[in-house]
Amino acid sequence: MWTPTEEEKYGVVICSFRGSVPQGLVLEIGETVQILEKCEGWYRGVSTKKPNVKGLFPANYIHLKKAIVSNRGQYETVVPLEDSIVTEVTTTLQEWASLWKQLYVKHKVDLFYKLRHVMNELIDLRRQLLSGHLTQDQVREVKRHITVRLDWGNEHLGLDLVPRKDFEVVDSDQISVSDLYKMHLSSRQSVQQSTSQVDTMRPRHGETCRMPVPYHFFFSLKSFTYNTIGEDSDVFFSLYDMREGKQISERFLVRLNKNGGPRNPEKIERMCALFTDLSSKDMKRDLYIVAHVIRIGRMLLNDSKKGPAHLHYRRPYGCAVLSILDVLQSLTELKEEKDFVLKVYTCNNESEWTQIHENIIRKSSTKYSAPSASHGLIISLQLFRGDMEQIRRENPMIFNRGLAITRKLGFPDVIMPGDIRNDLYLTLEKGDFERGGKSVQKNIEVTMYVLYADGEILKDCISLGSGEPNRSSYHSFVLYHSNSPRWGEIIKLPIPIDRFRGSHLRFEFRHCSTKDKGEKKLFGFAFSPLMRDDGTTLSDDIHELYVYKCDENSTFNNHALYLGLPCCKEDYNGCPNIPSSLIFQRSKESFFISTQLSSTKLTQNVDLLALLKWKAFPDRIMDILGRLRHVSGEEIVKFLQDILDTLFVILDDNTEKYGLLVFQSLVFIINLLRDIKYFHFRPVMDTYIQKHFAGALAYKELIRCLKWYMDCSAELIRQDHIQEAMRALEYLFKFIVQSRILYSRATCGMEEEQFRSSIQELFQSIRFVLSLDSRNSETLLFTQAALLNSFPTIFDELLQMFTVQEVAEFVRGTLGSMPSTVHIGQSMDVVKLQSIARTVDSRLFSFSESRRILLPVVLHHIHLHLRQQKELLICSGILGSIFSIVKTSSLEADVMEEVEMMVESLLDVLLQTLLTIMSKSHAQEAVRGHCPVTAEITGEYVSCLLSLLRQMCDTHFQHLLDNFQSKDELKEFLLKIFCVFRNLMKMSVFPRDWMVMRLLTSNIIVTTVQYLSSALHKNFTETDFDFKVWNSYFSLAVLFINQPSLQLEIITSAKRKKILDKYGDMRVMMAYELFSMWQNLGEHKIHFIPGMIGPFLGVTLVPQPEVRNIMIPIFHDMMDWEQRKNGNFKQVEAELIDKLDSMVSEGKGDESYRELFGLLTQLFGPYPSLLEKVEQETWRETGISFVTSVTRLMERLLDYRDCMKGEETENKKVGCTVNLMNFYKSEINKEEMYIRYIHKLCDMHLQAENYTEAAFTLLLYCELLQWEDRPLREFLHYPSQTEWQRKEGLCRKIIHYFNKGKSWEFGIPLCRELACQYESLYDYQSLSWIRKMEASYYDNIIEQQRLEPEFFRVGFYGRKFPFFLRNKEYVCRGHDYERLEAFQQRMLSEFPQAVAMQHPNHPDDAILQCDAQYLQIYAVTPIPDYVDVLQMDRVPDRVKSFYRVNNVRKFRYDRPFHKGPKDKDNEFKSLWIERTTLTLTHSLPGISRWFEVERRELVEVSPLENAIQVVENKNQELRALISQYQHKQVHGNINLLSMCLNGVIDAAVNGGIARYQEAFFDKDYITKHPGDAEKISQLKELMQEQVHVLGVGLAVHEKFVHPEMRPLHKKLIDQFQMMRASLYHEFPGLDKLSPACSGTSTPRGNVLASHSPMSPENIKMTHRHSPMNLMGTGRHSSSSLSSHASSEAGNMMMMGDNSMGEAPEDLYHHMQLAYHNPRYQGSVTNVSVLSSSQASPSSSSLSSTHSAPSQMITSAPSSTRGSPSLPDKYRHAREMMLLLPTHRDRPSSAMYPAAILENGQPPNFQRALFQQVVGACKPCSDPNLSMAEKGHYSLHFDAFHHPLGDTPPALPARTLRKSPLHPIPASPTSPQSGLDGSNSTLSGSASSGVSSLSESNFGHSSEAPPRTDTMDSMPSQAWNGDEGLEPPYLPVHYSLSESAVLDAIKSQPCRSHSAPGCVLPQDPMDPPALPPKPYHPRLPALEHDEGMLLREEAERPRGLHRKASLPPGSVKEEQARLAWEHGRGEQ
């Protein structure tokens, strides 16, 4: 049975549970659970992670923990009973876990590993806390480490800062806001300190300890590597100050054996010392670690003699130094141990041994020897900081290693009271000794003993250095042969204090012989007592001691024999009569020592001894007291208690005589303890006063003297002694109070009234001193300052003798006596406030009784200072302390009164102060940036204000509001507090991560607003309505709801729950307040329309549904009120749209916001009660329509916002912007917003360097302006100016952008428009400039090369696309050099989630509605709108190139497909063309690089119609070319004509036209298609026409052919006869051919019949210039039948059966084989290698080597564009089928066949032809080609092939040289043929910038020398073919293909562009605006030699689908005329 648990309430999961039982709760190890019930080994409860899910789990899976249960029952809460910091570590680690993993995902690897390390440390520290084995100090230290790491991690992860007190998280409810603010500051500083890793030697920021913290150097000797000494050695280490030239520390001694190891085996790894008590000043000294090496052994190291084994001498060997500054630079952390190597240098001269370390430091290399490489001391150093106890506690391992404490010589900066020292440091300086009759100098050794008064040698009183035990004797080192040795060794003498008096030192001098015996002979001694007769110790000085002669036989047993002798010169003066019969006689030798005493018990000061023994000198007492000031502080603190006892004894002895002197001495000693060096002796003083002071009568004299000093302060000029007495006030009162207590005890409280009276009088004197005007007396000012500083320190002493109220009255009177801030200087202001601050912080102020007395005077002073804006930081500190005390005392009844007092005194002035500070802060940030001081002051006062408001309750607010005398006062107060609150939220006073502080602030604000809103409603509605106050209130509410800290949606769920549990959702609270106040406005709502629409709209952007639901009705209300007032709600509408735009652009709003205004729509429908006030139904309809528009606007704005804030591509951003811009213009007619987005779009184009688009975009704004002088306001970046000026500036900018975009044709009309304006204003300077600009644009058009862009159709399908793209299709203008493959890759990179569709079919609904992204991309061909320019023969191709691809709105692509059964022998019977024409919304180029497709038209072209178009286009091309030669427009050679004729005739002979005959002239076809009779007749007429044209062509060719080319001509005649014969039966009239064609011809039989049909096994390649280019750019096929299907027949290539999917290299190889293989001779006549997967309109002539992975090659007999519909059998072979556009006017790639090789080389003719063509086909950069492919020449030879054995002879050598003649196109049958004199390899937009006028290598015949004149543009003139003259000029030749093609579309209407209409010709009959039409007369009819009359008509050709009605005639001329005119078509 399940029973509720009593004790088992909380536990931790120790084993994961899968919840495999019914109602089982899934648990993971480490989770915590709250247990509700138990039953037989099972628990029922919840996981704290998911508190809403209850379940079962095994009891043995849970580790129970103690917990505190509150509110037992169904809603009980359980808190684990554990250390709060353990709980915090647990929750923090859980929060960090997910964030830590994200760091790795975001590639923040460094922080990832750092955080992992910190998390492991926290886990370990938490484990230590839980162990329960730590001491309190250790627990505190562990907590400190934990908090540092927690704060560090939170800081780096961007989490909230946690305020702490004593390492515990504080509860914001339990402390004042001021304290909370200070804790945040403290936590921030500790985080910054732990993060910054600054130089850790510096004092930490924020340390409040006044004591200097000492440093300590840990030293460890690792090894001494040497091989040359071979003897034992002593190494002494010490710290040396190079600047002072002295040693500052004791020596650390290490004894080493001859191997370099410690002599004592126990010292291994324990040769370490701690150099202690180094001050900050010491660390700045030029310190060195100096090591002196003393060897112990033979006298001479290189002496081979073996001396006596028992005699060892201490001999100097070497020295090493290390700079401490270098150490400090390398030690980056305090506790980092680092190794160093010290090189040991040896001394060259032993006499300079004492200076060797200085010489090494100075690098005096001549005085020491460089060390051997093997010599070196390896040491490690570590720097510590802190007191010794702390170091010992933090580093126990170091102190366990036998650490030698090495102290400073002398006392440290801080002398600790318990530090007992009695050390005498003695230095053996030098000696001067006689030679003693010896020839060499002595080797002197000094031996020293310490002897007691009885002659006993003191044991262990000599220390050579720390680290080794003390000894009883000392032996100096020996300097070889030196009678004036200098030792410089420092010996420490730790003599017990009780043995010091009477002890003396004895120095014995011995000569150490180097002879065999090695004796040490005593020759003298010296001595020195340690204390003088007057009781002082040996002074710290150098002492010269007398040396007395003696020998080894002398005895020192009776020390009295020599102690009576003078030891030194000073002593000699005291012993004038020395008998000469003494045993010891003084020699002339001398010995020098120096001493330094560091003792806390002994003194060297005579004056101090005199004071302590004052009774011995009664007549000198006044002098002794006066000289006390000259005693050093160290001596005074050492004997502090004795001195104080002496002073008070003297005071009791004679008060009147010595009272003032004792008082002054006491003041001196008290002030001495204020020195930081002796600060730690204050406890000694306190202990003395409490336990040892016995002056019961002293208080009387002390009060008297103190009062006398104060009374004299107004008269005396020098007041140094008075100021010292004021500074000593604290301890003087301690003595006074303790003395009075002692007296009261002794007398049972006698003289109490006298004492109280004296204190009263003393305070009167104090008040007198403070009331004096010190503005003119600096001395008095210092006295007052000293008094005020000390005054708060006496409160605790007074409380021992007086009640709290009495002391408070004393203090109030004193503080009240101070002059106001107006009458004192600034420095005194500071001191006064500091005194008040210390008063507030004192224990006295914590009593409510005293606060009631003191608070008014404190508030009075603060109020005055705040009014004057003086010392704001100190005032804020005082207020913070007051609020802190009030908060802690908030349970007391008196607090209500105190808060009331503060509200009356402070609230208003606090608000005013904050407003002033905030305005200054704002101004400073604007000028100088963030100011930390100003920010700190602002934060302090904000926390004070919040503290006060938090303490206020209903009563306080009610009293506050009732106390206002008028509504104006109330209004002023409300405006102030609302303004402060607004600034609080706008200025971000508290940092972002101070979440606790921010939430508390918000809670206080919303509570305060709730109190004040009723006053606002009550006082400022109806007749007293005040817009300013209400507006301020609404603005505050809006700002409050929008605060980032309140947006709970972006924080973790745990944190959100915590906030909601504590505060609730304060946004909802404020929203309800806002709505309520709005409803209270009544008819005054109209005042806030439209002003508050934007702010309220901002509130709806908060992603909180309840807030949105509250706010939406307000908008309906606004619309309703404006409708009532104005009859419409245009203002609401305009403002709503404007604010929506700006806010969403700033990144606000979310996805659910799209549906927000749907809520508003409901208000017009389901709730008719809301419409009762609406009188007309139209209001409802208008409202719904408006909301619908706003909703659509929201969709676009959010799309725009998402594009802009993300890393989206240029196309997306432009598309969003254009979409939004059009919406503003067309749907809601917001011109200003429209113009704003015009400029945004322009900026995007400029950034992407789309200058043409930028110009068109700006042109939209320009068109809105007129040439008027209407003034325009400042807008965007435009200044205030007239409309004329702005339009002029815009025009100039647009012209500049058109120029940069190379779109000069668009810029010229603007130039003309500006010129008209300048001319009308007679501004000739500007007119000159603009005309020059226009002229330069004409030059640029003619001279500069421009690339023709490609165009691509893109379909965006699926719901995942942005709104403006979804399920739409666009045509995009590609970038320069961009082909289809590159464009597709770009689109897929822009939409990485998109899938490229593999077919061109229109997608079905499943794709359109799916949640995915599909892209359908293929290339399309532009259809120019304007054709006049393109039809003119004399217009340069660079001009035409522009009009072919600009101002284009229609595009098309073709798709070949088979309809019906497919004939394997002739596929053209069923091959249809599906032609799609796309019409865009706008022309390209325009304001975007792409526009949406507005309309699409689909037409199917039958096979027969396709054949008609192919033959017709070839006929037009032939006529044009022949006409050029007849008019001698192409002079010199006739290669172009030769190749063109060869291509047509050869293709016809080898199966070209025959295929059409087989397909369409068959009886079966005619029977099955009776409706095609007319078209079949038309095709027959065109074939007949072609025969006639070929006949004329051959006649012209015969006339001009070079003799060497006669074999070719003969071959053409023969093949022509075969062609005519093959068509004889169909066209009976063909047997009557002109003599020119038949004279020399012999029929060869029906070649067509024997020719194998074109099958898939043969190579079939699509020619890119097929006649189906007719509607687009007029491209023609290379033979009459070379394109049964249009070259536009699709955008995918079709391959034959066997060539399907071949790589381009394979195709190329296949074609070469076809030309070399006799099987293919004559059949492969029209070969062109297609471009690759992006074979596109601008494929260049180099595209033959480009791959075609996405294309299919059709089985057509000649070039067709492939179909996107691949035959089923091939679908598997190509996964990617991209629709490609047809090629526009580009020369195709040519591939010349290598027919017959002459000795491995091509025949002469082909060799020459290759040179000619290659010259014209320079390598260029085709964007379709890869880099590897761009290096190849790709030649296109359309059906130019010579049968075997019929090769013409080679051209003469002279014809191979270069000639400036016209080039030929890459293909002899290319659409530019002979007329295109300017035929370009790049054709306008080819990529390499090669000139469009390619060179030709064709030479002239020998009869006609080559011309050197260049092409010109003179008008053409008639020329008779019979004349054998050169033409009088060389005309410019342009492609006939354009006029032929564009005739078909000439009649199509021209679309007006967004640019001015004069950019392009409007009427085809008028001259085009750019450029002007050249003179273009009609050509007269030309008579052919053979009588054939050819007539050129200027009329346009027939359309695509036309009926032919002319029957064939019987007369040849009529046939020729009819054939010639057959190109005229009907529209």
Swiss-Prot record:
Keywords, ordered alphabetically: Cytoplasm, Guanine-nucleotide releasing factor, Phosphoprotein, SH3 domain, SH3-binding
GO molecular function: GTPase activator activity; guanyl-nucleotide exchange factor activity; SH3 domain binding
Region Disordered, annotated ranges: 1672-1695, 1731-1768, 1846-1925, 1971-2027
Pfam family membership, one: DHR-2_Lobe_C
Gene Ontology cellular component list: cytoplasm; cytosol
Domain named SH3: residues: 6-67
InterPro entries from the UniProt entry: ARM-type_fold (IPR016024), C2_Dock-B (IPR037811), C2_DOCK-type_domain (IPR027007), C2_domain_sf (IPR035892), DHR2_DOCK3 (IPR026800), DOCK (IPR026791), DOCK3_SH3 (IPR035767), DOCK_C_lobe_A (IPR043161)
UniProt biased composition (Low complexity): 1676-1695, 1731-1751, 1877-1899
Modification Phosphoserine, positions: 1655
Biased composition (Polar residues): 1752-1763
PROSITE patterns: C2_DOCK, DOCKER, SH3
Tissue-level expression: Expressed in brain, spinal cord, pituitary gland, testis. Not expressed in heart, liver, kidney, spleen and lung. In brain, it is highly expressed in the cerebral cortex and hippocampus, while it is absent in other tissues, except in spinal cord. In the cerebral cortex, it is found within the intermediate (III and IV) and deep (V and VI) layers, whereas it is weakly expressed in superficial layer I. It is also abundant in the piriform cortex. Within the hippocampus, it is expressed in the pyramidal neurons of the CA1, CA2, and CA3 regions and the dentate gyrus.
Gene Ontology annotations of biological process type: small GTPase-mediated signal transduction
Location of the DOCKER domain: 1225-1632
Listed Basic and acidic residues bias regions: 1981-1998, 2011-2027
Subcellular locations according to the entry: Cytoplasm
Job description of the protein: Potential guanine nucleotide exchange factor (GEF). GEF proteins activate some small GTPases by exchanging bound GDP for free GTP. Its interaction with presenilin proteins as well as its ability to stimulate Tau/MAPT phosphorylation suggest that it may be involved in Alzheimer disease. Ectopic expression in nerve cells decreases the secretion of amyloid-beta APBA1 protein and lowers the rate of cell-substratum adhesion, suggesting that it may affect the function of some small GTPase involved in the regulation of actin cytoskeleton or cell adhesion receptors.
Domain notes from UniProt: The DOCKER domain may mediate some GEF activity.
Protein family: Belongs to the DOCK family.
Name of the protein in question: Dedicator of cytokinesis protein 3
Species annotation: Mus musculus
Higher taxonomy: Eukaryota, Metazoa, Chordata, Craniata, Vertebrata
